[in-house]
Structures are given as structure tokens and as C-alpha cells.
Amino acid sequence: MSFWPQSRKARRRLTILLAIAPVLALAVGLALYGLRDSISLFYTPAQAQEAKVSAGRKVQLGGLVQHGSVVKYPDGNVEFVIADQKATAKVVYHGDLPDLFREGQGIVAEGSFNPAGVFEAKLVLAKHDERYMPREVSKALKEQGEWRGEGADAPAYGSQKP
């Protein structure tokens, strides 16, 4: 009994399939390899500690800016602490913070942890009106019992009706 089909039509189909499959697999592999730097997972400080996020890996870190933690330096660096109910994470950011950034508000910072465990943010996103809370942040805060009700009735970004 042979693997190769007996009919000419079936052999042609199998030959085409065997020729296309590796090319398709290579194309998918190259696409995923190219996208690896643009993919960033969302974590709260507690989830990042539990997952033991490796240093240098691009992630999004979200939570509430802890009261009294914001320190602005003359060189443009800003340090603050993002907190959830279970853990905190120190964040360092160089640049101008969004106008709506303030203590006690939900934010999402995109960047990576350094070997010392400090989150080096490349981008800081703050909520953009008094009722909006980023979907990932509000979901994580609700799961941890930290949800304070602000923006509880607000629609998530992208689901607002005009």
C-alpha cells in the first residue's frame, strides 16, 4: 500500500498541497515574527508579579496612580507608583504626561520592566473624560474589588454611541 494516490487527479492535488503547505507555513511564521514587537499584553501590578514578566518584554501596565507617589524631576523624568488592591509597581517615564494624568486616576503605561523591577514606560495613557476608564483597567479593578464606582456607568472606549 503506497502513500501516493493511484489516480492522476489525486496525485496532482496532493502535489499542489505539498508544495503550498510549506510556503504558507513560512508566510505565517514570518508574519508572526514581524509582529512580535508590536504585541503587548496587559497586566495589573499584581498580575505582572504573579506572571514574573521578564525584563525587557514589552507589556502594558495598568492601575490607579497612587496618591502622593508622583515625583517630577527637572530633567523631564517622572516617577510614580501604579497600584491595584494586591500590589504596586514603580514606574519611570521620561516626557510630558497627559493633561488628564493625576493621582488616584486609572492609567495604562506601555513599556517594559528593567532588571531592578522598575517599569520603564515609553507611553502613558490617561482616561480622557471624567467618566471613562480603560476597559482593561476597569475589568482588572472589578475582579480585585478595588473598583471605586467612578465611571462605572460609562461606556468603554469604542462602544460609545454617537
Swiss-Prot record:
Q: What does this protein do?
A: Heme chaperone required for the biogenesis of c-type cytochromes. Transiently binds heme delivered by CcmC and transfers the heme to apo-cytochromes in a process facilitated by CcmF and CcmH.
Q: Which residues lie on this side of the membrane: Cytoplasmic?
A: 1-13
A Gene Ontology BP annotation from the UniProt entry: cytochrome complex assembly
Sequence segments annotated as region (Disordered):
140-162
Sorted keywords for this record are:
Cell inner membrane, Cell membrane, Cytochrome c-type biogenesis, Heme, Iron, Membrane, Metal-binding, Signal-anchor, Transmembrane, Transmembrane helix
Taken from the UniProt entry, a GO cellular component term is: plasma membrane
Q: Where are the transmembrane segments?
A: 14-34
Query: What is the protein's given name?
Result: Cytochrome c-type biogenesis protein CcmE
Q: Where in the cell is it found?
A: Cell inner membrane
- Give start-end positions of Basic and acidic residues composition bias: 140-151
Q: Which HAMAP family match?
A: CcmE
Q: Record-annotated residues binding heme?
A: 128, 132
Topology in membrane? Single-pass type II membrane protein
Q: Which family does it belong to?
A: Belongs to the CcmE/CycJ family.
Q: Cross-referenced Pfam families, in alphabetical order? A: CcmE
Species this protein is from: Caulobacter vibrioides (strain NA1000 / CB15N) (Caulobacter crescentus)
Keyword Metal-binding carried by entry: yes
- Report the domain of life of the source organism: Bacteria
